[in-house]
């Protein structure tokens, strides 16, 4: 990917600050012997769950109805250059409210939920591979490595609890309006069927990142615009929008030659772009991990919402499975429907034999132990305690997890997307996950806010 750090005299700020600037999905990748540099998470405005189409993962793959999540598009404004004074401030975790350990129901070995503490330990050790060298995390991660060494990487729930209380303080996340409850959704890693050769059986390509796709990282110009970027291509000396879905999915695509795998089902390709990563089962039995590489910069538009607005589906049946069923019964209308979403995601093949996809932290995410958050409000890599309910249920789900991923629709202090793992069962849970919940964040006692105030 080409990255430009020069100042364009006319950057459309309204575009850069739109709700969906990246792909509508979670970009996850697989683990290498040496951990890769963390990449930006997918932007998935459908990702009501971790990023679903019409309604994020809620559409993801379940028959469970979802409430459509709208990507808010900016109102037309005059073009202007944002100066550092005008630019929005980066959050400094000021919405985190200190609480006592005993105030958090379920985060104690005596609560009947103690086993969950030790089960979260492998995910925490993954976080430490990325955080351990950072000053504010170094002491806690060093102690974690020592505890793992002493217990053969299997500390008891009591040992984990004692460790957490010794090295961490706990904070309740809140929203801007002061409320402490928010939406908890889910995402997963799908399984597709494909081939390295195009054929009548496998006609739909996955594309590598195009050579002419340019990304402008706005924080190189304005630190206040961290996580903001624009994408496009050069025509002469002018940066113009990159090709949209309708322009790419034609008989002679402008990015021809970047195909690397072909899939048997166009619907599966579309939803793979929403999830951001997946497993492709090849004809010879080989399984290939594919992960998010980049996105064309076009705004994500939920096709589920389009179907609801047209009266083709109701909110009650606009789940991911409901959308798939509609698509298979209306193949003559499918291409036009998909083109309503101009966003397009490019992939890359990941190393074989890896334990799972990589999240935005740059470490492998683990099923039911990793969660996507908004890094403006929750430090990436931190342990978080999630209190919500099981998908489509009132059964409590209280679990220590790790904030190891992000998502374009995961915005706000009390907002999370739970990674359920890979395959059909995980997809069913992810698609049904649209629950209310609360979140607590565990931060090292040395952790310092942007305001230079030590959290105690």
Predicted feature locations:
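C-terminal soluble interaction/assembly domains
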Residues: 21-25, 113, 353-456
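Gram-negative bacterial Sec-dependent N-terminal signal peptides
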Residues: 2-20
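Bacterial Sec signal peptide processing site at the extreme N-terminus
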Residues: 14, 18-37
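Secretory/export targeting leaders with adjacent low-complexity proregions
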Residues: 88, 93-351
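Residue-level signal for mature regions of secreted extracellular proteins and peptides
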Residues: 13, 36-38, 64, 134
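General secretory precursor processing signal
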Residues: 23, 46-48, 74, 131, ...
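Secreted/extracellular small peptides and ectodomain modules produced from precursors
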Residues: 18, 41-43, 69, 126, ...
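N-terminal low-complexity, Pro/Thr/Ser-rich intrinsically disordered segments
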Residues: 38-49, 54-105
């Amino acid at each position: 990917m080409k990255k430009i750090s020069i100042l364009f005299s006319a950057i459309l700020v309204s575009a850069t600050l739109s709700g969906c600037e990246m792909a509508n999905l979670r970009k996850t990748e697989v683990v290498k012997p040496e951990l890769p540099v963390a990449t930006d998470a997918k932007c998935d405005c459908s990702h009501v769950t971790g990023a679903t189409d019409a309604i994020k993962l809620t559409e993801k793959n379940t028959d469970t109805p979802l409430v459509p999540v709208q990507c808010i598009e900016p109102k037309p404004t005059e073009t202007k250059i944002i100066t550092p004074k005008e630019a929005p401030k980066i959050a400094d975790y000021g919405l985190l409210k200190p609480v006592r350990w005993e105030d958090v129901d379920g985060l104690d070995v005596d609560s009947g939920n103690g086993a969950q503490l030790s089960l979260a330990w492998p995910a925490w050790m993954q976080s430490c591979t990325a955080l351990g060298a950072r000053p504010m995390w170094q002491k806690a991660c060093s102690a974690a490595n020592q505890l793992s060494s002493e217990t053969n990487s299997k500390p008891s729930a009591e040992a984990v609890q004692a460790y957490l209380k010794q090295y961490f303080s706990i904070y309740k996340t809140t929203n801007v309006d002061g409320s402490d409850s928010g939406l908890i959704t889910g995402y997963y890693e799908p399984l597709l069927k494909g081939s390295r050769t195009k054929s009548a059986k496998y006609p739909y390509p996955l594309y590598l990142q195009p050579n002419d796709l340019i990304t402008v990282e706005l924080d190189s110009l304005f630190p206040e615009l961290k996580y903001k970027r624009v994408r496009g291509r050069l025509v002469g000396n002018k940066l113009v929008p990159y090709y949209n879905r309708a322009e790419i999915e034609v008989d002679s695509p402008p990015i021809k030659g970047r195909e690397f795998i072909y899939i048997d089902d166009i619907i599966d390709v579309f939803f793979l772009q929403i999830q951001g990563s997946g497993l492709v089962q090849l004809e010879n039995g080989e399984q290939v991990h594919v992960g998010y590489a980049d996105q064309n910069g076009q705004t994500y538009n939920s096709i589920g919402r389009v179907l609801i607005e047209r009266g083709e589906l109701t909110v009650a049946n606009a789940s991911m499975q409901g959308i798939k069923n509609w698509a298979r019964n209306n193949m003559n209308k499918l291409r036009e429907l998909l083109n309503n979403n101009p966003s397009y995601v490019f992939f890359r093949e990941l190393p074989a034999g890896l334990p799972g996809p990589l999240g935005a932290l740059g470490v492998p995410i683990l099923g039911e132990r990793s969660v996507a958050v908004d890094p403006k409000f929750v430090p990436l890599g931190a342990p978080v305690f999630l209190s919500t309910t099981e998908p489509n249920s009132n059964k409590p789900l209280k679990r220590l997890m790790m904030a190891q991923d992000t998502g374009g629709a995961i915005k706000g202090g009390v907002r999370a997307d739970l990674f359920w793992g890979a395959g059909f069962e995980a997809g069913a849970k992810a698609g049904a996950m649209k629950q209310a919940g609360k979140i607590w964040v565990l931060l090292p006692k040395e952790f310092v806010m942007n305001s230079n105030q030590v959290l105690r």
